[in-house]
Amino acid sequence: MIRAPMLTLLCLFLVPSLADATQHTAGPPVVIKKSQVRDLSAIRSSKVLRVLVNQSRNSSGEVQGEAIGVEYRRLQAFEKYLNGHARDGQKVSLKLIPKAKDQLLAALQRGEGDLVAPGELLDASAAKYVDPTNAVVSGVPLVLVGVRGERSFKRPEQLSGRTLMLTSGSAANQAVVQLNQKLALHKLAPVKVEWVDPSLAVEDVLEMVQAGIYHLTVVEQPIAERWAKVMPKLRVDRSVALSNGDMQWFVRKDAVMLHATVDRFLETWQAPANQDVAFQKAYKDLYRVHYPLAREDRQRLEKLRPTLQRHADAQKMDWLDLAALAFKESQLNPGAKGGSGATGLLQITPSAAQRVGVGNIRDVDGNVQAASKYLAMIRRKFFSSPRINERERMAFTLAAYNLGPERVQAMRTQAKRQGLNPNQWFFQVERVAMEQVGMGVVSYVNSVNKYYLAYDQERSSLESPSQRKVVSRD
């Protein structure tokens, strides 16, 4: 896997404009003529409302027919509202187009959708030809989130010198810029921001905060409180509110009738009391990542490192991919036993080992050899296309290791039918997996990815025994 280290920036730097947003997680490119930017009459004639949604599971996720994304339910209600007010009886259906949050407004400007529903605070001040609707949720504070048992904060000024982990497009960036200006007046150190890997959404960052991999983040209070219900170790510091704004939808300036219709809908719409039942059911008992860099875990990893590195090198893999998989599968326990004969450090099955010519999977060397060869075989046979970047290639390989390569290939085919990017697992093909088989394989790939990112940020100390250290989580 090609490493994509997180970019550490002082928040006094400005974020790129929407027009220059990096296309790191976009779906397949869509070219639409300007004449196809439509108002409500054209939308009704086409019978399709194209909605650009934030690709995060928190915003637009669906698990086996159950909506878990906050925008998903609102949009379903809006679809019902539109069809209830159709004069000619023509029904309109929604087409959701998932994109990274920082790409949504630019996609709307290009005419790739009719409506943007981000599910988070989104600043549209730099976007041309875009209008915000009435508030979806009014007066939303951005609050600090840490983990229970660690230091809490009472005032924003106490964040001086601290680092916040933020997703690309986070509304917290501008709030931190303003906070740093105040800190500078008092000659205090600025708050720093680390932009997390683009494979992570806001819910992933919160999970990594709960695990202690990341220390602090800032998110919208409703999002923090929602996820704290299924991640009880999270601590929401409501007294440290960096800013306050309205969550909104967005339309093109020339879509006057659509804008008016959305505003009328939002004036009366109220979230149902049971809107999070499916969300809590999907996430309550789901696997949660742990902190993988504690002293004992580091010691175990150091003993296994030569074996992991040797076999990773033989298969042209990153040894930290194998380490992350081993932590997820067995917590680095060579004696672990699982179902269906899965054995050892990497929980390889005898049948999978036989496919790559390895007979003994009971000792560490044979187990790692079999698993690395099997992963390499999957990668080579099913996911070798140059259209798949290395990060996504590993994600597909992990999904196939867990679910079977043929099933993952079928999901890619279905993703293409649905207008998703078949060469991108994160936030694209994984949506098909959530629809078909639930959260299991999605959680599996995400967990291994998070362990990889945790290891990768400590790569130098893990690879150089003289630099080994135990990372403090204070």
Language-model segments: what does each one mean?
Residues 22-124, 128, 195-200, 220, ...:
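Extracytoplasmic small-molecule ligand-binding "clamshell" domains
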Residues 24-43, 69-81, 147-173, 223, ...:
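Extended ligand-binding regions for polar small-molecule ligands
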Residues 50-59, 64-85, 141-200, 295-307:
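Bilobed "Venus flytrap"/periplasmic-binding protein-like clamshell domains
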Residues 76, 87-158, 222-226, 231-243, ...:
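Acidic, polar ligand-binding/catalytic clefts
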Residues 121, 146-228, 360-368, 372-384:
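Pocket-lining segment of extracytoplasmic ligand-binding domains
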Residues 284-331, 365-368, 382-386:
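Export/targeting segments at the very N-terminus of extracytoplasmic proteins
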Residues 335-359, 365-377, 423-424, 448:
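Substrate-binding/active-site groove segments that recognize
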Residues 392-459:
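Catalytic and substrate-binding regions of cell-wall glycan-acting enzymes that process beta-1,4-linked
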